[in-house]
From Swiss-Prot:
InterPro entries the record matches: Tobamovirus_resist_UPF0261, UPF0261, UPF0261_C, UPF0261_N
CDD domains: Tm-1-like
Annotated protein name in UniProt: UPF0261 protein SACE_5696
Organism: Saccharopolyspora erythraea (strain ATCC 11635 / DSM 40517 / JCM 4748 / NBRC 13426 / NCIMB 8594 / NRRL 2338)
HAMAP family per record: UPF0261
Family label: Belongs to the UPF0261 family.
Lineage: Bacteria, Bacillati, Actinomycetota, Actinomycetes, Pseudonocardiales
Length: 411
């Protein structure tokens, strides 16, 4: 059976870590305890056994050696130990990992968790788990457990919370999950306003492929690209590239400057489109920046306000996408839905703007370096028309012919 790694600072949380390790081991899971204390090489509390792997051994995995960790400055020490822990775990067959900590321990342990493949069970019991945890979790599957009380001693509350977390890890490591490894995994990106298109395409792929749909909310795009980098995605149908709008105009659902980089790095077969490139996302209406208050705004729901992209923004969006796709070494098709890029971009709908769409399409056509494997395809339909789904599947078969899904690129 795979090994569970129980990680934390044994100089301050030895009893709690030992308690968790014992519960996981009681479920029949092999356990290795790992000390990441940064206070110095002498660690461990009187009421807890020493860790199986000491903090000096872990610190030695830092590129500059253990001295880079034990600096005497807590801030730099935590950052350096995080690097060391990531490198330490990377060299081991990790079946699952659980860590305990406050803000410092959470910042120390979660980078190593994020570096592990999606699907490896990861549990972080943290004092900061009840707030915004996006900086700790990012686009991965870390399960954050609020500690409720501080991680500072065993009591009736902490025993229950830590016990639940320990059993969650053990259950994840020992439970059976039906495998779909016989089908290559294909990623699709979707938004509410491109749902008809993506649902139709996904349903027609299911017989031969394992379609994985990602919500294009920033985190969704990053998650998809992480799986591409991990070799778990065999082809990408990136029909909803809307996260680029938020990057360009300062919306709340940007996937960052690295959007599309994994596609270029890996050469994965790629079919893309302009799904929801007509909109920038903000929160509730009152959160829309003052400079945008006179723009074409649409209240999607009480928590989401959409802003129509202008021709100038569309020009910048098109240039960004073209530059990224020019770097791709794999087969690329990028489809332009001339009838509109979303449900809101259709005749009579609030974001229908053929001029803005026209600028977007012209920039993509002029700046994308087209050749046999990298092509723009105009489609005279709205992105949600059934005929557009037909065009997507035709392009998909074309890119698969140019770049077959490899055996290693499966779920």
């Amino acid at each position: 059976m795979d090994t569970a790694y129980v990680v934390g600072t044994f100089d301050t949380k030895g009893a709690e870590l030992g308690y968790v390790a014992g519960l996981v081991a009681a479920r029949g899971v092999p356990v290795v305890t790992v000390d990441v204390s940064t206070s110095g090489p002498e660690t461990g509390t009187a009421d807890a056994r020493p860790a199986d792997v000491g903090n000096v051994e872990v610190a030695g995995h830092h590129p500059d050696g253990a001295a880079a960790v034990f600096t005497g400055d807590r801030g730099t020490a935590v950052t350096a130990m995080a690097v060391a822990l990531e490198r330490f775990l990377a060299g081991r067959a990790v079946g699952g990992v659980i860590a305990l900590g406050g803000s410092g321990g959470t910042a120390l342990c979660t980078p190593a968790m994020r570096a592990l493949p999606v699907g490896v069970p990861k549990v972080m019991v943290s004092t900061v788990a009840s707030g915004d945890v996006s900086s700790y979790v990012d686009a991965t599957d870390i399960a954050m457990f609020p500690s409720v009380t501080d991680v500072a001693g065993l009591n009736r509350i902490s025993r229950r919370v830590l016990g639940n977390a320990a059993h969650a890890l053990a259950g994840a490591m020992t439970g059976d999950i039906a495998s779909t490894e016989d089908k290559p995994a294909v990623a699709l990106t979707m938004f509410g306003v491109t749902t008809p298109c993506v649902t139709e395409v996904a349903s027609r792929l299911e017989a031969r492929y394992d379609p994985l749909v990602f919500h294009a909310t920033g985190t969704g795009g990053r998650a998809m690209e992480k799986l591409v980098d991990d070799g778990l995605i065999g082809a990408v149908l990136d029909l909803t590239t809307t996260e680029v709008c938020d990057l360009v105009a300062g919306g709340v659902m940007s996937a960052g400057e690295g959007r599309l980089d994994a596609i270029a790095r890996t050469g994965v077969p790629y079919v893309g489109s302009c799904g929801a490139l007509d909109m920038v996302n903000f929160g509730a209406f009152e959160t829309v920046p003052e400079r945008y208050r006179d723009r074409n705004l649409y209240v999607h729901n009480p928590q989401v306000t959409l802003m129509r992209t202008t021709p100038d923004e569309c020009r910048e969006i098109g240039s960004f996408i073209a530059a990224k796709l020019n770097a791709c070494r794999g087969p690329v098709r990028f489809l332009l839905p001339e009838g509109g890029v979303s449900l809101l971009d259709a005749p009579g709908q609030p974001f229908h703007d053929p001029d803005a769409d026209g600028v977007l399409f012209e920039v993509l056509e002029s700046e994308l370096r087209q050749d046999g494997d990298r092509r723009i395809v105009r489609v005279p339909h709205n992105i949600n028309d059934p005929a557009f789904a037909d065009a997507v599947l035709t392009a998909f078969e074309e890119v698969l012919g140019a770049g077959t899904i490899q055996e290693g690129q499966r779920e």
